[in-house]
Amino acid sequence: MSEQTPRDDGEIFTLVDEAGNEELYKEAMRFQSPETGKWYICLYPLDEENDEEVGIQAFAFEEPTSEEDELELLPIENDAEWEMVQEVLNTFIDDDGNFNA
C-alpha cells in the first residue's frame, strides 16, 4: 500500500562526507511514491534547524524489515525521481518559504 501522506519521525541521522567528516541531519519528511512504491526521505543539517534557510538532502531508501535493521540511504537515480521528490517537497513549503509537514 502506498503512503501518500508524508510523515516525519524526527529521526537523527549521521551522514559521512567524502572526506570522512560526520554531520548530524534531522528528518524533515519521508514518503512513498504511489507510482513506483519507492520510499524517499528528506533530511536537513541539525545545526541549521533554527536557521531561516536550510539545505535539504533527499535520498531513496527501502523500509527496514525489522526494528534491528538500519535505514540504508540510497542515491536518487535519475532526473525524473529528483523532479518528483522536488514536487512533493514543494507542496509543503508555503509562500514565505516555511516547511509545513
Swiss-Prot record:
Superkingdom classification of source: Bacteria
InterPro entries registered for this protein in UniProt: UPF0473
Disulphide-bonded residues: none
One Pfam family per UniProt: DUF1292
Family to which the UniProt record says this protein belongs: Belongs to the UPF0473 family.
HAMAP family recorded: UPF0473
Protein name: UPF0473 protein LAF_0524
